[in-house]
């Protein structure tokens, strides 16, 4: 965000907030249509399309470096991500079993966390290697190639070329792979318009929709603005220590997913959600009002404390429904538009008052997520084992 504000001369944080807004707005638009497309064309074509859209989006901005193109690129990438999310969520529940869905979803979140942890590190590496003040030819074929095709004053654009290459590899892999025919139960298919209308009449659907919205608002509101907060209040360099803090945020989220996979086999998911919420509130308050040292520790630690929230809320939601699980998954995926709403709320409040005040609103999102742990009544609880059973002799 700091680099984007600087390179495009954006006047306020709200302008920068339009970037995640354009990305996550695509979720609200594409999630339900993606489910209908899966029913018509099958999983593999939509999976391929889910990688094709981000490929188009990344290569567009990599070639045309303007703020409007960045917004368009983010939107196109978001469309593809919505397609991928809608394809994969019901399949996870089918392959892993209903009682293990929270665990499988946590495993998927773990893989997401690894990629998110590595991304800021790659960003820092590319910024350092392509810095126009220090770059000299001969650093290696790949770095020299990126230097030739990336604007000297915008070395961070090189990250888009890296994404383009990775997405091309995924397109080839999906294209040549033999995708098995997966028979979903009738209630796991995306369903007709009537199934969506029936779900929209259910109170719990809207309550869980709001839960996913609040989670993504929390995740994005924290990760997007923590570097800017550390720069404004503690003088932290956003390209080095700030980027490292963001990397640690995602790295600790990855570690939290590993811990979560174990805890979900031992403790009821609702109790874990309550504990995670209370811990997150404590960490956010420490990050926003603590010293530089405390903030540098507390912000990344939020990644650990929220790591189980998404998979738990999603599994509680689907396991609270007796039918139309595929359609419900599409509705829940559209709630990822919270990644647009959360940063916009934070940035708007920050421009009107201060960034600290804006980020305090994240506590409202966390409070609601914590509340879900008290009122949720799933039809199927996550499968747990007792510790003493693990040590019984065979």
Feature locations, PLM:
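Extracytoplasmic gate region of multi-pass secondary transporters
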Residues: 119-128, 198-247
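C-terminal membrane-cytosol helix-exit motif in multi-pass small-molecule transporters
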Residues: 123-132, 141, 145, 151, ...
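Conserved MFS/SLC helix-loop-helix module at the cytosolic interface between two early adjacent transmembrane helices
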Residues: 29-68
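Intracellular juxtamembrane helix-capping segments at the cytosolic ends
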Residues: 83-97, 307-322
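Central cavity-lining transmembrane alpha-helices of secondary-active solute carriers
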Residues: 17-36, 247-259
């Amino acid at each position: 965000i700091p680099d984007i504000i600087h390179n495009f001369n954006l006047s306020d944080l709200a302008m920068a907030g339009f970037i995640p807004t354009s990305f996550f707005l695509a979720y609200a638009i594409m999630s339900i249509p993606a489910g209908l497309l899966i029913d018509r064309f099958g999983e593999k074509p939509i999976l391929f399309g889910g990688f094709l859209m981000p490929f188009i989006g990344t290569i567009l901005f990599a070639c045309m470096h303007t703020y409007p193109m960045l917004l368009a690129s983010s939107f196109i990438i978001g469309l593809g991500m919505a397609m991928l999310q809608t394809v994969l969520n019901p399949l996870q529940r089918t392959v892993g079993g209903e009682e293990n869905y929270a665990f499988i979803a946590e495993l998927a979140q773990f893989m997401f966390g690894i990629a998110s942890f590595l991304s800021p590190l790659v960003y820092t590496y590319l910024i350092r290697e392509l810095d126009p003040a220090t770059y000299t030819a001969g650093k290696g074929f790949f770095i020299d190639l990126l230097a030739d095709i990336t604007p000297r004053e915008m070395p961070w654009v090189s990250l888009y070329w890296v994404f383009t290459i990775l997405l091309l590899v995924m397109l080839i892999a999906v294209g040549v792979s033999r995708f098995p025919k997966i028979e979903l139960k009738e209630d796991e298919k995306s369903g007709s318009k009537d199934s969506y209308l029936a779900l929209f009449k259910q109170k719990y659907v809207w309550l869980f929709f709001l839960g996913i919205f609040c989670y993504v608002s929390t995740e994005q509101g924290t990760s997007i603005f923590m570097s800017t907060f550390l720069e404004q209040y503690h003088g932290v360099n956003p390209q080095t220590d700030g980027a490292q803090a963001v990397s640690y945020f995602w790295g600790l989220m990855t570690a939290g997913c590993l811990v979560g996979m174990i805890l979900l086999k031992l403790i009821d998911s609702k109790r874990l959600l309550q504990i995670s919420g209370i811990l997150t509130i404590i960490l956010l308050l420490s990050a926003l009002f603590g010293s530089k040292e405390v903030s540098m520790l507390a912000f990344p630690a939020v990644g650990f404390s929220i790591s189980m929230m998404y998979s738990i809320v999603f599994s509680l939601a689907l396991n609270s429904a007796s039918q139309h699980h595929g359609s419900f998954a599409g509705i829940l995926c559209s709630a990822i538009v919270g990644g647009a709403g959360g940063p916009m709320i934070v940035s708007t409040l920050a421009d009107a008052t201060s960034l600290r005040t804006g980020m305090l609103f994240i506590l409202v999102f966390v409070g609601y997520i914590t509340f879900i742990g008290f009122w949720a009544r799933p039809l199927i609880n996550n499968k747990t084992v007792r510790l003493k059973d693990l040590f019984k002799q065979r």
